[in-house]
């Protein structure tokens, strides 16, 4: 593990001197290796809840996110801070995906972003097995629930990677009823 504390990591990369609401508690849960559900309002700093601990830990964080625009924003933001992050987006050729995954295995990337649909690819599975994944972050986790308003079937298959990736999982969402929370935890194998 790195030498910096969560707060020092936050200050170094984001320039903030304190955490918002329950961020620090969530980060400590993640650092202790527990599966965690982060229920924070929009603008509540959900991404910091997985980015800070992943920077502190050896290895790479696998981030599953449904929105290409959000993925591109987060990757650009991390890169601007000098943090190595990349995304597998739908516009990439098989060869580009192949090269990107190799870079994640042999390079010192900290974040790999991809959609739940891209995560279903067998080649992606094979390459993930070769990576030292420190955390699985599932953004917009309410999309896993059939109770939710923007259900995405590919989200139901995210838990399959837990059979070959031994890493804690953090599920993040701004909106979840108690039923949706239970559903998220069940479907992600908490």
Predicted segments, located by residue:
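Pre-Walker A (Motif I) flank of P-loop NTPase domains
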Residues: 32-38, 59-61, 108-110, 167
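Conserved helix/coil segment N-terminal to the catalytic DExD/H
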Residues: 44, 51, 92-135, 145-149
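Conserved nucleotide-binding/hydrolysis micro-motifs of P-loop NTPases
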Residues: 68-70, 92-94, 118-120, 142-143, ...
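Conserved nucleic-acid-binding Ia/Ib motif block in the N-terminal RecA-like helicase ATPase lobe
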Residues: 61-63, 68-114, 183
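Post-DEXD/H (motif II) to motif III coupling segment of the RecA-like Helicase ATP-binding lobe
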Residues: 129-190
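Conserved pre-motif I regulatory segment
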Residues: 2-41
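Motif I (Walker A/P-loop) of helicase-class P-loop NTPases
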Residues: 45-58, 71, 154
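Walker A/P-loop
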Residues: 33-52, 62-65, 173-176
